[in-house]
């Protein structure tokens, strides 16, 4: 990676974590294979030639903004301002691309966001989508540049700014094109958009529309009947806990058997509220402090390493199970999983070929399977 971004999440990782978490992934090959977002700042002539020769499409590009001076400043890379010219080179090679903006309050929002949206929408049809995600900060951030997270009013302003553009895109070509991260709706206290607004969820792997997708999977799996009768605790990040609780009430309206347990992220800081960044130690602490007596515990599969039952702090899932031998602890990845576990706990078992959505740099999520936040 040629950058030292103001908002780099890799630089905010706590010490003594799994070493692979500190690997920066600004690599167009990973972008093509796994949907990782890249900035294109480390691209040379040979890279563009290879992309053209092999037709590596689509790619996933972290734009952040289209103002050349501001982009170079935010990425701390003097040659980062050429993003529109670089996108043009991809287009000349017949390459399509998805884009994202990591939105930082007071930097690339407001008029700068308006400029970015205008520039990227003008690059259709090569530009396939634009995702806007809020900057994520942890308590381990040491970068001296002041960044703040969006509050309720700030998130509402972003939604209000983007919605007219979404309506314009739908009027022009029947799809939304511009998608906001679920966190904006959570922060603003608003409902996430209906599934139709996500156009098949082209940036689901980036965490865009996970909540609506999860609800849709639940609804598709739901059958008439009540909960299975087992007493279950549902571990989640604080952001999505209300959504999980609302679904649980459909099966257990009296709140007698299903208890959603929002876990504060003590490791990264309370401002980090997604399920996929919960570590094993924080989950264990929450279970020790839990007042309800339960038979089983559902944990987010997204908190486990891709293809391996290990949390971000290198705690194996088996170690968590060993600490609570009286509890059956199972990962849940999708809305269908969640429904199956709550409605038929005795027969629920997920053979996990993959850990669901796994956090990657720049506030993104990576392929290949659906997951739970």
Where are these regions (language model features)?
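Short glycine-rich or small-residue beta-strand-to-loop segments that form or flank ligand, phosphate
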Residues: 100-102, 130, 299-303
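Short loop/turn and capping residues at structural boundaries
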Residues: 62, 101, 131, 331-333
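Conserved Radical SAM active-site core
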Residues: 1-126, 136-165
